[in-house]
Amino acid sequence: MDIFRVLTRGASVKKESGPKAKAADYSVINGNDENHKEDNNESQIVKELDFFRNKRIISKVEDDREKTTENDSPNKEEKSGNDDGLIKPVITNTVEASALRKSYKGNVSGIDIPLPIGSFEDLISRFSFDKRLLNNLIENGFTEPTPIQCECIPVALNNRDVLACGPTGSGKTLAFLIPLVQQIIDDKQTAGLKGLIISPTKELANQIFIECFKLSYKIFLEKKRPLQVALLSKSLGAKLKNKVVSDKKYDIIISTPLRLIDVVKNEALDLSKVKHLIFDEADKLFDKTFVEQSDDILSACREPSLRKAMFSATIPSNVEEIAQSIMMDPVRVIIGHKEAANTNIEQKLIFCGNEEGKLIAIRQLVQEGEFKPPIIIFLESITRAKALYHELMYDRINVDVIHAERTALQRDRIIERFKTGELWCLICTDVLARGIDFKGVNLVINYDVPGSSQAYVHRIGRTGRGGRSGKAITFYTKQDSVAIKPIINVMKQSGCEVSEWMDKMAKMTRKEKESIKNGKAHKERKQITTVPKMDKAKRRRQQEMIAASKRRKNEELSKKHFSK
């Protein structure tokens, strides 16, 4: 399979046809045409979400659905429909449920836990699942639920609070979007905001928005009103504040915390009637950076029957405590281990001795043929990311760097080049560890050891997505002796083979845990460079001589000026 073909499964704009998505506020009104494009032979691969070009993807989704099926094969109807020869599993009792959970290492706890589903068709008999929604799932290549979807969808459709943890790329987004769309279809009340999804980053919010649009396509509510989804952009926020757009126009809104709070405080958006509140990447939304904002959002949602859901690839103990305090009899769903990485990822540690050794290690990967693009390299700071970029660029590696200091247009162009295969390697910081969602990445390199096990899981989760395999390599030096201990724990919990010395490594002491938590385990690192020390000293002396010469000239000029 051409990996860059997989990577570039984004969409392009065809402005001449199809209903246009409103670019100003990212709101979506579903179309009503009846012809659909059949999935190709790679339909099992989840389509890539180009979050920097959401308007373009929306147009593509609409265009694809408007194309006729004149060239479709005669057997297309049989392929798109249910195969009578295929027996879909239906879970009818707790014994079958236990067997299913054991098969995917699911750990579900709580009071009166609903039975999981064995297939999407199972939802029709159990929950009167909307056939238009099921059709949208199948047309987008989602034919079978993933383990986390098997558990979370029936829990949510029973109107229960849920705390869910699953590996990166395990289908968590659909696990909360499918029941949300179904519950809004079932709600026969008047129009108004019913579903609210909170994401820590704009990129992730864009991604959720695109998926929600695909699911809600051609779904109509009361009086033939289309289900409306919106991404709370700066433009839409201004329209809500100025009353250009009614806050009752949308059924689902997706937003980052600060932007939502700004609109709510200006009384431009009423959250008191919201019935479904979802926190994606809950571990980030309830850490010290976002916890106050998340609390403000919870306070604004005053509906007595409010259903709350939290999803993430990692669930620290403090997030579990918060969940228990704000949720009503929640069902806790853990797929695999809550601190483990995706089992499709081969994890490896490489000792480099010092900072110079890391550059040598990358060059060895290139020479040995392990540097297989597409590749993402993570570093701990923007300064170090820039330095590594310059080093690899001079090695003639097809590389670019993306970080918070780059403009939106620059990030847009870099992502586009990476998707099309023009770029082989992308260097970035932790700021984008949760936002980038490419399905074809072969290798992730942690040039710097991550600051926590959660950061490590999210970093390496950029590969091994959609059921494909991937590889993650972490470089470490002598000064990382404490910082790598959480990484080794994640590797063990993920079922990776570890060296004998890793098994014999002493457990972390309380002092070491505190140092990692407070960021003290990561000491100041040397500059990334291959320039010899003698050359550095020579350059430094030259710079000092130039500075001294300029200083003398300025002093002479000032003396002449005052003497006059």
UniProtKB/Swiss-Prot annotation:
InterPro entries: DDX52/Rok1_DEADc, DEAD/DEAH_box_helicase_dom, DEAD_box_RNA_helicase, Helicase_ATP-bd, Helicase_C-like, P-loop_NTPase, RNA-helicase_DEAD-box_CS, RNA_helicase_DEAD_Q_motif. A motif (Q motif) lies at residues 122-150. It is an enzyme of class 3 (hydrolase). A motif (DEAD box) lies at residues 280-283. One of its GO terms (biological process) is maturation of SSU-rRNA. Gene3D superfamilies: P-loop containing nucleotide triphosphate hydrolases. Residues 13-23, 33-45, 62-86, 553-564 have a biased composition (Basic and acidic residues). One of its GO terms (molecular function) is RNA helicase activity. Changing G166D: No cell growth and 2-fold decrease in ATPase activity in vitro. It is found in: Nucleus, Nucleolus. Residues 153-333 form the Helicase ATP-binding domain. This is ATP-dependent RNA helicase ROK1. It comes from Saccharomyces cerevisiae (strain ATCC 204508 / S288c).
